[in-house]
Amino acid sequence: MKIWIKRILLSIAALLALSTAVLGFLSSRPGADELRGSVEINKPSADVWAFLEEPEKLKSWVGWMKEIREATPGSRGVGSRQVWVMEDMNNGGALMEINGEVIAYRPGRSKTVRINVPGVFTGETEYSVEDLGGGRSRFSQNSKYAFANSFTKLLTPIIMPSASKKGKEDMQRLKNKVEAQ
């Protein structure tokens, strides 16, 4: 094999190894697998809470949401389960089913949902609504994820900024929907 071909192949291998090392380092940083965000809404907290509890209202502000299936119809507290069917626009519009189970619940204030997509990720998301007085409230969402395989874990520095952007868009949509009613 000609020497220049060997050099090109070695350079490509070195770039791949370096890229993998950088992604590995970035994905292992504290907080790399977490998302946090909040938005102030010029409506009372009860109005915001309805957009977390009522499936049609929830679908109206969570982007990519196509369907919500109640696994425990009528139940909203600890142990209630839903399946969110999402059209993942970062994956060519493929449908993804996210299983969720409420593991902590304070009506009108907060709920924590354990979520999973088998073979892809698991996580927990806390949704909270804080009364700021004067008919204003703050909605917050804090999530932590664990990816199911090494390749996906390696892509954390690419996946999480995209998820963060979507989360911010969703929160702005929530603000607009609640304030418009």
What are these regions (language model features)?
Residues 4-72:
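Hydrophobic ligand-binding cavity/cleft-lining segments
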Residues 30, 132-134:
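Surface-exposed coil/turn segments at beta-strand junctions on protein surfaces, enriched
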Residues 5, 9-12, 40, 70-119, ...:
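Glycine-rich portal/gate segments that line the openings of hydrophobic small-molecule binding cavities
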Residues 3-22, 138, 144-181:
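A conserved amphipathic terminal alpha-helix motif
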Residues 41, 45, 51, 92-96, ...:
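Solvent-exposed, acidic/flexible segments
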Residues 45, 49-55, 62-65, 79, ...:
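Extracytoplasmic/secreted envelope proteins and their assembly/folding machinery
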